[in-house]
């Protein structure tokens, strides 16, 4: 027991050390990219000020004379060349910065931010055919809210300023506010009606929900972020084998750990 605990402590220390080292490497690279962008903006601003100053003193330029018009045309051509040169340099530095940041991706994957799901996603095909997994049973009164009912794989989620790396989304028994008991009480009839009308041979409505939740989390078509409760709303359209649209699955998960809050079908 002592050895196991000590081994875990060593692993955690190494994990944190790698993460901190990677974070320290990211900061100067981000700063360099920011400084390059600011420098480019300043240079463009200076060029713009020169053009505005020239336009403000048109009389001194003698634009009504052939020589004045020719000189002003050369001036504008030079400034256009300067603008193109600044944009090219800024773009090149931006691409170089992106390459430097990509070089750190393997370090972040080593500390848990890479796509390393434990639960494989379902095939992105219409239901059926599909072999659902068995959901664990929950006591009706919510005596076991932390019991795991089913684990789904979720793709990387990103919306607005919030993101969640790929991993597992757990459906717990929960209570009246989240998990299977919430889905069963609030949305069980919706799942049942669609399953009974469209896939009567599929059996329990949970079979349809199992596929729909799994496919939506693994292959999301739209993701929205709710800052008020720190959740992602994940959407995917569901169709019959012949391609006819039936409903859209909406799955709400925690943006912190991917826990499934609720899931239900939308037909409008």
Swiss-Prot record:
InterPro entries the UniProt entry points to: DUF4226 (IPR019710)
UniProt similarity note: To M.tuberculosis Rv0025 and Rv0026.
UniProt-recorded name of the protein: Uncharacterized protein Rv0739
GO cellular component terms attached to this protein's record: plasma membrane
